[in-house]
Amino acid sequence: MAATEDDRLAGSGEGERLDFLRDRHVRFFQRCLQVLPERYSSLETSRLTIAFFALSGLDMLDSLDVVNKDDIIEWIYSLQVLPTEDRSNLDRCGFRGSSYLGIPFNPSKNPGTAHPYDSGHIAMTYTGLSCLIILGDDLSRVDKEACLAGLRALQLEDGSFCAVPEGSENDMRFVYCASCICYMLNNWSGMDMKKAISYIRRSMSYDNGLAQGAGLESHGGSTFCGIASLCLMGKLEEVFSEKELNRIKRWCIMRQQNGYHGRPNKPVDTCYSFWVGATLKLLKIFQYTNFEKNRNYILSTQDRLVGGFAKWPDSHPDALHAYFGICGLSLMEESGICKVHPALNVSTRTSERLRDLHQSWKTKDSKQCSDNVHISS
């Protein structure tokens, strides 16, 4: 059998550490959508997030043709927590992470099945909607009003969000998930934006990074979540002054060593090449970073045998770091990788498809409004 380009690169000695082995990463993401290793079993309740990393990773590699899109779309819709006939569970709607509860398979828009322990999870709703858009679905079977009602029920008085209606930790991660959900559904009624903005604003720490909440430690991940949320809202420059933005930029740019770390005096980690790199991109100063050092670090964590990326060199690859490693390389315009939308965390091709979808909804609503006016007159 003829050797692939990746096989030739993998046998090329010193150059193998610095070559991006695209085909191996495609196969790695394919495996993530099939039977997972035992060590992933604890993630069963959030399987939809693993599907997101794999599907968006394949999309970034322009390789979605290797999966059965229709089957995956049906599976994702079966995870939607739909309103019951009496709509008494609206505050619990959204998407669950997998079929672990044994709820009947229902990929339709029919009324849901009442279950005392069934509810959506904010991160699963975010990744579920993202996956559907990545796969080219038009979201016609998403009960948008129910998703937004479920989202509203998760916002707390301080403006942050918890993950599930039963209560959980509440922090900047879920503010970002909520912002993405509202942005994708093109409807910001799912949150009190003023309260969410206030929460982001109060989370700015003494050293000018953003924390998970007020009074906590600045972190690269929470800084991304806060800045990206404001960008999706179109409020970044209203919330922070130019002087404050310059301080945030300085804090972010100081996170680079070779790759990036999330906090001072912590080791670099592959995923921060996206979290911090995307923040710098949104702040329009990514071009001032050292691309070569960042690229070399990311590729030093590449598994040259099975594909994927790890958080550190000589560690096991996983779906999360494989995806964010590729997104980090995309920010530097690596050959063979599509461009990433830094705020929404999907390919720009997917973000453009979403924009077209929003336009079609707007056209449909305008026509319906016009028809109603015509009928009433």
From Swiss-Prot:
GO biological process: one example: protein geranylgeranylation
PFTB repeats: 144-186, 193-234, 245-284, 291-333
Pfam families membership: Prenyltrans
Residues engaged in binding geranylgeranyl diphosphate: H219, G220, G221, R263, P264, N265, K266, Y272, S273, F274, W275
Domain of life: Eukaryota
Group of enzyme by EC: transferase
Keywords annotated in UniProt: Magnesium, Metal-binding, Prenyltransferase, Repeat, Transferase, Zinc
EC number per UniProt: 2.5.1.59
Catalytic activity of the protein: geranylgeranyl diphosphate + L-cysteinyl-[protein] = S-geranylgeranyl-L-cysteinyl-[protein] + diphosphate
Cofactor: Zn(2+); Mg(2+)
Protein residues bound to Zn(2+): D269, C271, H321
Cofactor-binding details, from the entry: Binds 1 zinc ion per subunit.
Function: Catalyzes the transfer of a geranylgeranyl moiety from geranylgeranyl diphosphate to a cysteine at the fourth position from the C-terminus of proteins with the C-terminal sequence Cys-aliphatic-aliphatic-X. Known substrates include RAC1, RAC2, RAP1A and RAP1B.
Family of the protein in this entry: Belongs to the protein prenyltransferase subunit beta family.
Quaternary organization: Heterodimer of FNTA and PGGT1B. PGGT1B mediates interaction with substrate peptides.
Protein name: Geranylgeranyl transferase type-1 subunit beta
Organism: Rattus norvegicus (Rat)
Lineage of the species this protein comes from: Eukaryota, Metazoa, Chordata, Craniata, Vertebrata
